Amino acid sequence: MREKGRRKKGRTWAEAAKTVLEKYPNTPMSHKEILQVIQREGLKEIRSGTSPLACLNAMLHTNSRGEEGIFYKVPGRMGVYTLKKDVPDGVKELSEGSEESSDGQSDSQSSENSSSSSDGGSNKEGKKSRWKRKVSSSSPQSGCPSPTIPAGKVISPSQKHSKKALKQALKQQQQKKQQQQCRPSISISSNQHLSLKTVKAASDSVPAKPATWEGKQSDGQTGSPQNSNSSFSSSVKVENTLLGLGKKSFQRSERLHTRQMKRTKCADIDVETPDSILVNTNLRALINKHTFSVLPGDCQQRLLLLLPEVDRQVGPDGLMKLNGSALNNEFFTSAAQGWKERLSEGEFTPEMQVRIRQEIEKEKKVEPWKEQFFESYYGQSSGLSLEDSKKLTASPSDPKVKKTPAEQPKSMPVSEASLIRIVPVVSQSECKEEALQMSSPGRKEECESQGEVQPNFSTSSEPLLSSALNTHELSSILPIKCPKDEDLLEQKPVTSAEQESEKNHLTTASNYNKSESQESLVTSPSKPKSPGVEKPIVKPTAGAGPQETNMKEPLATLVDQSPESLKRKSSLTQEEAPVSWEKRPRVTENRQHQQPFQVSPQPFLNRGDRIQVRKVPPLKIPVSRISPMPFHPSQVSPRARFPVSITSPNRTGARTLADIKAKAQLVKAQRAAAAAAAAAAAAASVGGTIPGPGPGGGQGPGEGGEGQTARGGSPGSDRVSETGKGPTLELAGTGSRGGTRELLPCGPETQPQSETKTTPSQAQPHSVSGAQLQQTPPVPPTPAVSGACTSVPSPAHIEKLDNEKLNPTRATATVASVSHPQGPSSCRQEKAPSPTGPALISGASPVHCAADGTVELKAGPSKNIPNPSASSKTDASVPVAVTPSPLTSLLTTATLEKLPVPQVSATTAPAGSAPPSSTLPAASSLKTPGTSLNMNGPTLRPTSSIPANNPLVTQLLQGKDVPMEQILPKPLTKVEMKTVPLTAKEERGMGALIATNTTENSTREEVNERQSHPATQQQLGKTLQSKQLPQVPRPLQLFSAKELRDSSIDTHQYHEGLSKATQDQILQTLIQRVRRQNLLSVVPPSQFNFAHSGFQLEDISTSQRFMLGFAGRRTSKPAMAGHYLLNISTYGRGSESFRRTHSVNPEDRFCLSSPTEALKMGYTDCKNATGESSSSKEDDTDEESTGDEQESVTVKEEPQVSQSAGKGDTSSGPHSRETLSTSDCLASKNVKAEIPLNEQTTLSKENYLFTRGQTFDEKTLARDLIQAAQKQMAHAVRGKAIRSSPELFSSTVLPLPADSPTHQPLLLPPLQTPKLYGSPTQIGPSYRGMINVSTSSDMDHNSAVPGSQVSSNVGDVMSFSVTVTTIPASQAMNPSSHGQTIPVQAFSEENSIEGTPSKCYCRLKAMIMCKGCGAFCHDDCIGPSKLCVSCLVVR
């Protein structure tokens, strides 16, 4: 006491209060009581006017918080404190009956009440006993499930506020409920009762609180149960707040307390009706972290789940915790308010809940027809597992799909309840199956078939399917030729792949978006939505066979119906591609076109035409199986089936919004498909490639690949089959899209692919005509449309189409087509250029097989170069393997592997003249877009007067050669590459260019005449040649294309550096290539010869490309290049093939002076392709495979290519690579084909080149080739190479067909180029960029050069642009840069080559890159959205 006295004066409130509490250790006291003790015992000197109570209260508040606090605020009471060290005792007492551990609220309430009642200032002891008594009395309450508040927990002011709010609410409730409820009207002391009751209710309802929470959180979504829960939860909260309320109540006795507890049990807080006290309570005050923490753990966890993720934290123990601001933010506040309002509106009354539920049921009803398509996640119905779906979705184009799959189940409940029923209830696979079953049988079958194709896509099933497909396809390629085999195969695949296909198909159907690529693949099979779905399934595996069979049957039919079928097909195909890309809507469009056929197609599908049906199911397949075939490609998606031809109809005509949309869709789809299709392509490559055999047949297996192509290419193939007899022309006339492919199939009229091969010369004229000649002079306009259509369908399709177009030229081409189709998505396509190679190898080979009638061709001939079988298989396998990582892997693998394969294809080509076609097809496919453009060339030509990207032209061309270039409109050829490179390239490529020009002219004419005769072709070629030589100045265009490339990389420099050093380099590269391609060894010489001529070949179509390829083979590699190659190949092989190609690119033809030259060119083309490949090899990354494939051919051409392409490749590696790859493939094949033809030797122009048989010293060859190319280039350049060449050179193509060759491709390329331009390198698969370089003939040049055409020689310059066009699919895959855009553009261009580029009237404006696709267009065109028209349409 002495110490106390001494310190009394200086003692703080905290010390005084501590002293008091120490004296009465087990007696919690309120601040008033403490003050009384202090005053009584004089523990602190209290001066007057200091408001001691306030000071003490503030001190207690402060010191009861935090770890440092010396006081412990008793939880349930208003202001009752005890010393922290005494807490254990107090807690013990409190926890009598586990009060503390029991509901902290109830505990605090009772204690609070007691303290309040004892407030009167009873002595501490009384207080203590009272407290104890309370504790015991509340003890029952403590029994409540809610967790205890830890001893350290103190009620915070917020809690106090909530208590106040509760108090008020309770008063009202008390009044209201005194009458209503069994609660006796308790006197005011009853307040306490109420509070207890409430507490009890709260504790009872605690479990419900989660629901309450939920109710609050879920804005009115919660049903009555939730509401009741929420009401309970609020009651719980109320309980918390109530705890403090008791304070007011008067002293109560133990029995009162007990009675209270009992009453509370039956008393409940109304949380349903508007009478609820909660309506007038601020829920935010009732619900806070303190009241929340009082709830039982399980309730807290359940309630936390109702909160947004941001408002809950997951602790290290995995338990969720309340975020600091979770219950204290505007969202929770508004939710609480909203819940209160809904409560007051009676929304939670049982009657209302019932009504609401009924409404939801009504709303959520999905139309039955929709229900069968519903999938909780993409691909569910097709049997994809959620993981697979996510993978597919993730890599392809549909992130949302990926996301949705997981999320969908949640969202599904309301709108997708029915579906969910199926999906959730049943296992996913079951669900899928269910859904499939739900769908019409046809649909189911279709699904299956699609699934089959899809397996390629789906990672898990992919390998199996692809293996199965491969084996089936391979084994069935020949067998499939006969319907019986087909059926067997079909059945087999169907059984094995049925489930997968079903699932996949569903997936495809459900998520068209998801993997449009996939869709591409699937679409073919899927397209056979009709009853013949099963067959469609087989189609993928045995699709080639069935298609082939179909093709054979229809071939005859085609001959008769080819014009109409083709037309129908091309339209359908074109439409179909869009359908698949556009997804269902496009299908509808297609439907319109195809409705007449639709019913019939299904039947057809049922029949053995299934494969065709795949392509044409929506088409009037009945008209001819060929029709169905076109559908097949078109059939990218099951939906496409009916509407397969919607877009197509326009393709040839004016560019309608639908066309634009279709194009955009295609591009978009291609992008998505790039990945999906890349995977699919890979799978298709493996499985699809084999299917490759026939544009139609190949499609079966390649349905995945070609099926995708099917949309664009397959239809063509099928169409070709349909128009097998002369569909080429027809195709050209028809629609490039389907037409192109049709053209190819035309070749294989006899059999889809087999026939192609079988009738390479015979059909090739048509095929070429159709494929390449889709650009045939006669059909150019249509082809333009055709090309456009093809473009529109999808880059892949286009490429496929192109490939297919080429296919007719050569069976291999068909394969390539298939392969491209595999690349169907742009991916494959882009890759296809290179994948085309692979496709060619694996696909082309198959084509060979088809052509030869033996799968062997596929492995054997194809394998010629690398290892046909291995290559083919590898390619196919790789694609399959790649499938999992659709885009990249596929692209890379497909490209690399496929490229080599294409070489193989090339090699094979020699084996069979068709095989060269195969190689060409790759190139052709690349070129095809160009060709398409070329065809459109005339269309575009009008617009080619001024460079579309003047600034680019100026900058890229560096203004030296700009005059020409500037003049050139370079329609989308962003590549107005530097002119400078042109020079170097020009020099070395001059000769080639000249030759190319000549060849191109000749080729062009030959393209027209190709169908007629080699001789005629020669004449035409010569005529054209003479014509085109003047076009040589077109080099500018070439340059422009090249520029494109350069712009990506230092193509210019490369080209510039081409000079001797580069040439030497190239020579060495060529030598390497030659060595590599010893098989092609023989070809290499000719290839080299062709390489010179190649430029011409490139110019032509193929030849032009080669020349370009040689000088700037890379450039020539562009879409056109492929075409050119094809042309050349055809030419070399038989003027027919070439002619066809030329036909496709009549303008290109000029390149080939004569059949011999054509042959030479063809060979050169082959070589060029090889060279390009080599060049690519330099850009190995980009076009490794292509390099291989193109090796021998490339060897010679490579020097130039190495120089130009090498650098160009490097710069536009991906583009170049792809282009080269394709070109190379085509070239190789061509070369081979040509070699076999031996025509190349005949090529006088490229005479100095080597006979195809010759295996000159690699260096010599390369040197000769370069020299020849240079000479030609010089001439051409002199004439126009200088202007054109720069472009070409710039492009990568170098001199290539800067003039003509470039022109033609440019036509198509313009669109592509820009895309490519943006990211040539990025777009490894976009080798098409090179195609870009290839100049098409005058016509093409004109058309193509809207932006980059010199002036008079529209065709010449244009070629370059085309390059990009081919790239679309790949580029789509390579979203990396412009490549992606290119697909759109390419498509657009191809699709509506009609002048997408040429239609742009702001050539002089600055060009900017589209953010969506990477395509380049004018600032005015793109506008503030920074999106091109295609992207805008798609969006």
Swiss-Prot record:
The gene is ASXL2. The modification Asymmetric dimethylarginine is found at R641. Core component of the polycomb repressive deubiquitinase (PR-DUB) complex, at least composed of BAP1, one of ASXL1, ASXL2 or (probably) ASXL3, and one of MBD5 or MBD6. Distinct combinations of ASXL and MBD proteins may preferentially bind specific histone modification marks. The PR-DUB core associates with a number of accessory proteins, including FOXK1, FOXK2, KDM1B, HCFC1 and OGT; KDM1B specifically associates with ASXL2 PR-DUB complexes. It comes from Homo sapiens (Human). Residues 690-707 have a biased composition (Gly residues). Putative Polycomb group (PcG) protein. PcG proteins act by forming multiprotein complexes, which are required to maintain the transcriptionally repressive state of homeotic genes throughout development. PcG proteins are not required to initiate repression, but to maintain it during later stages of development. They probably act via methylation of histones, rendering chromatin heritably changed in its expressibility. Involved in transcriptional regulation mediated by ligand-bound nuclear hormone receptors, such as peroxisome proliferator-activated receptor gamma (PPARG). It is linked to Shashi-Pena syndrome: An autosomal dominant syndrome characterized by delayed psychomotor development, intellectual disability of variable severity, macrocephaly, prominent eyes, arched eyebrows, hypertelorism, a glabellar nevus flammeus, neonatal feeding difficulties, and hypotonia. Some patients may also have atrial septal defect, episodic hypoglycemia, changes in bone mineral density, and/or seizures. This is Putative Polycomb group protein ASXL2. Contains two Leu-Xaa-Xaa-Leu-Leu (LXXLL) motifs, which may be required for an association with nuclear receptors. Residues 182-195, 451-463, 506-527, 593-603, 750-770, 815-827, 864-875, 926-935, 1013-1029, 1200-1225 have a biased composition (Polar residues). It is found in: Nucleus. The record marks V20, L21 as: Breakpoint for translocation to form KAT6A-ASXL2 protein.
